[in-house]
Amino acid sequence: MSLLSVSGIPSQTQNPSISVVKRPLATFHPSIWGDHFISYNSKSMEISSESLEKVQRLKEKVQSLLMAPVDDISQKLELIDAIQRLGVSYHFESEIDTILQQIHNNDDDTGDSDDLYTVSLRFRLLRQQGYNTPSDIFSKFKDSEGNFEESIIHDVRGILSLYEASHMRVRGDDILDEALHFTTTQLESMVSNLNPSVAAQVRRALERPLRKWMPRLEARHYFSTYPETASFNEVVLNFAKLDFNIIQRLHQKEVSELSRRWKEDLGVPEKISYVRDRVVELYFMWILGPYFEPQYSHGRMMLGKVASVVSIMDDTYDAYGTFEELKLFTDAIIRWDNCCIKQLPEYMKSTYQALLDITKEIEEEMSKEGRIYGLYYTKEAIKRLAQAYLLEAKWMKEKYIPTVEEYMSNALVTGGYSTLVTLSFLGMGDATKEVFDWACGNPKIVKAAETICRLMDDLVSTEFEQERGHVVSALDCYMQAARCLKA
């Protein structure tokens, strides 16, 4: 879609000499949620004392199971795996860490086992916990020619376990690179011959390994498949389900409050009609992603409020403001002063005021916690984001296609991931100044995540953006550099 002409003043003025403002409007899909969460009854989200007492009793039983001695260490590994996949491991972090440390320190615990399933499960759980378990443990499953043995091909459970373990590989884990290729090939070839239940597990794993599923989605899914496992324990499942429902009530309460603020305080979509009406999407993807646990409720609310304003900023730069207006807006954000409001176009004033209000709220919260330094990092992250948005707007205005390197340098910022990482620490009381310094120092792990997020976003949005004459994507920059045409 090309740029649309929109009158810059009220339509009832019919002066033909009035200039017409061209805005890069986008046709965003409407929210599928509407006022669903706003209409939630607060009483329906209350948690009964009976439920809290029951979940505590079940928690104690699961804790006893976790700490009980076992003859076969694989039983303990399977219990830990179930607890993690069911989304309740946050209750037992200390216990799980102690158990896995003992297993890591004792190489006899499955280290000499010839059971592919158990060896792979042990490896994955230890790598997830941060232990640099050597990958050459899988050499025992190779033949003299360096290929994985024929004997394991029909071990579906073992192959699937090795497949999941291979996704914990790091640079230099050549055997895990081979394992990923081998297991993927085997699973794809056997899936059509498996019973429906196992086939469904395999297809889901091939679509996305455990490491890449959001914890809440994996927990909800595993409720239905866990009973089919040989290690199924009804107490563990009942505890996980009740805990899930209790936390879900908390999440519903949070998204209800954020939705109400989105509509009533920020005025979306009635007063600010050009932005994506996506507060529920923001909550689910941006906020539950970093942390779903109940102890981070305050952090989610703080992050949600900032993310809401940042989303409006994004669409203002991307789908409404002219370059001249955006320069004024960026200048106001850099200066961060109430006095700047008067220099802004009318439609920008409420967004800028909301930005000032939320940072004032953060200042008050951080002061109470003795962590006022968090305010500085919040402002700097948003300023950096605004400057990157403005550069994109400049490229669009000039129809400039940057080099891949030039594009990625700016696009990693506009993707918002590094901003999200920084802001997610606001509501975490144990996040020190050193933590914020680390997050803002462009660490490799954050840069890698930024790169993945940006490229994935560009892959799915390029066609839509090109239709509206939008700023180029990584794909456009690469195609120009490679002098190739769209297939």
Residue locations for each model-derived region?
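Terpene synthase/cyclase
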Residues: M1-A487
